[in-house]
């Protein structure tokens, strides 16, 4: 079926999952805010019709839209049933895949979407899955003219588009960026659903697969422009932010590097070096995180250790992860700030013979990262995909957010929906 003849513009798959319910609510909010003429037909998909209806009813109550359940399609679909995945994909132009961990459940969705000419956006933060999908399916997706766009939530839209925003705001050539993520919490603290915890456990437990995948990829190194960016110590002090920091172990570095490769090889852009960190406050927080990290890295090496980590997330994460996830109050009181420190060269400066002579600082700020900012980012990526098709890379394929949306108005959309990009300072040295 041609995509213009399909009954739904987008389908939220995994709508009754912990993150999926918030994505569903965000799609509903977007559609309610739209003018009648611009509203898009959409659906939710999952294994249980009853649970899907409950999610819609909850969103209807929260948004004051009693008729929501009757306005949204419902598709029964099971990740273990390829025929049901095909049937779902045939009914949509775009699937928003919220079913993780993606290393176990992501590939069947990608495969079904490509085979049925349907594009797909996910919120995966697992580098091994993201890079594997590019290696296996980029050419197949391009042949079908569909777009598979990964990591379109908090992992890794703020980082990926934040680097592009910093590049676009610099009056010269940006050559290197360091980002520092700061999570701001209220009195009740931070809590993350254990789905993210499980993805981290499986990812660290199988690091060898990612190394092997990269070793056989035979990709040419991306050239380093200007002074090589020095990596910080595992624990370092950031004077600008008055805080200790540690390396950020999510998907941001993998995603940003893939974006920079794509932009360099396909659009001849000057590549940007990148490093990512997370601030942890004072020395007490550093000690606490060091103990948590040592426990995690020891247990994750062994099968029985991984089982214990999965069974007792609250204990081994020192209370940061739980099977219940955050309360509404915790989410309301939490926000994030991602600060980017960039360096580069003014126009006309010889890069090979000089040190960087421009500094720039930008920020991306937003609400709670996992279940407020992630749905906003995913839904605005979807709206951008559906409305700015002429600005996407030609021909389809498997893309990072930065590669897919570098020429679109996604940053403008995010700014209007509470994920704000801004320049803090810019100066010549």
Swiss-Prot record:
Molecular function GO labels: oxidoreductase activity
Residues with Phosphoserine modification: 209, 215, 217
InterPro entries assigned: NAD(P)-bd_dom_sf, Saccharopine_DH-like_oxidrdct, Sacchrp_dh_NADP-bd
Enzyme class: oxidoreductase
GO cellular component: lipid droplet; midbody; mitochondrion
Keywords: Acetylation, Oxidoreductase, Phosphoprotein
Entry's family note: Belongs to the saccharopine dehydrogenase family.
Protein name: Saccharopine dehydrogenase-like oxidoreductase
Gene giving rise to this polypeptide: Sccpdh
């Amino acid at each position: 079926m041609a995509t213009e003849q399909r009954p739904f513009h987008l389908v939220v798959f995994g709508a009754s999952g912990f993150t999926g319910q918030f994505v569903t609510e965000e799609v509903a909010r977007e559609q309610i805010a739209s003018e009648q003429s611009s509203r898009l037909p959409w659906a939710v998909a999952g294994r249980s019709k009853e649970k899907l209806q409950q999610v819609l009813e909850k969103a209807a109550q929260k948004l004051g839209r009693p008729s929501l359940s009757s306005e949204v399609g419902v598709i029964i679909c099971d990740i273990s049933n390829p025929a049901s995945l095909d049937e779902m994909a045939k009914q949509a132009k775009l699937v928003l895949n919220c079913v993780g961990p993606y290393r176990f459940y992501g590939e069947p969705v990608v495969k079904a979407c490509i085979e049925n000419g349907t594009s797909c956006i996910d919120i995966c933060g697992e580098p091994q899955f993201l890079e594997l999908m590019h290696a296996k399916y980029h050419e197949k997706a391009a042949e079908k003219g569909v777009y598979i766009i990964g990591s379109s939530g908090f992992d890794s839209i703020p980082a990926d588009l934040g680097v592009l925003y910093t590049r676009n705001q610099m009056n010269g050539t940006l050559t290197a960026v360091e980002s520092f993520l700061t999570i701001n919490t209220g009195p009740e603290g931070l809590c993350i659903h254990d789905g993210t915890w499980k993805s981290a456990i499986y990812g660290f437990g199988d690091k060898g697969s990612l190394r092997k995948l990269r070793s056989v990829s035979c990709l040419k190194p991306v050239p380093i422009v200007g002074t090589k960016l020095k990596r910080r110590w595992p624990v370092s002090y950031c004077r600008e932010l008055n805080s200790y920091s540690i390396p950020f172990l999510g998907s941001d570095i993998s995603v940003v590097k893939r974006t920079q490769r794509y932009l360099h090889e396909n659009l001849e852009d000057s590549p940007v070096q990148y490093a990512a960190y997370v601030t942890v406050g004072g020395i007490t927080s550093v000690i606490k995180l060091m103990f948590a990290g040592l426990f995690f890295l020891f247990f994750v090496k062994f099968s029985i250790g991984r089982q214990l980590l999965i069974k007792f997330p609250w204990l081994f994460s020192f209370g940061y992860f739980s099977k219940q996830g955050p309360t509404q109050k915790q989410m309301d009181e939490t926000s994030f700030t991602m600060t980017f420190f960039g360096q580069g060269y003014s126009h006309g400066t010889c890069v090979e013979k000089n040190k960087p002579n421009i500094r720039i600082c930008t920020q991306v700020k937003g609400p709670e990262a996992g279940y407020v900012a992630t749905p906003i980012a995913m839904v605005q990526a979807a709206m951008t995909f559906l409305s700015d098709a002429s600005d996407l890379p030609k021909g389809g394929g498997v893309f990072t957010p930065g590669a897919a949306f570098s020429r679109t108005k996604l940053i403008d959309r995010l700014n209007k929906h509470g994920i704000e990009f801004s320049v803090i300072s810019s100066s010549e040295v």
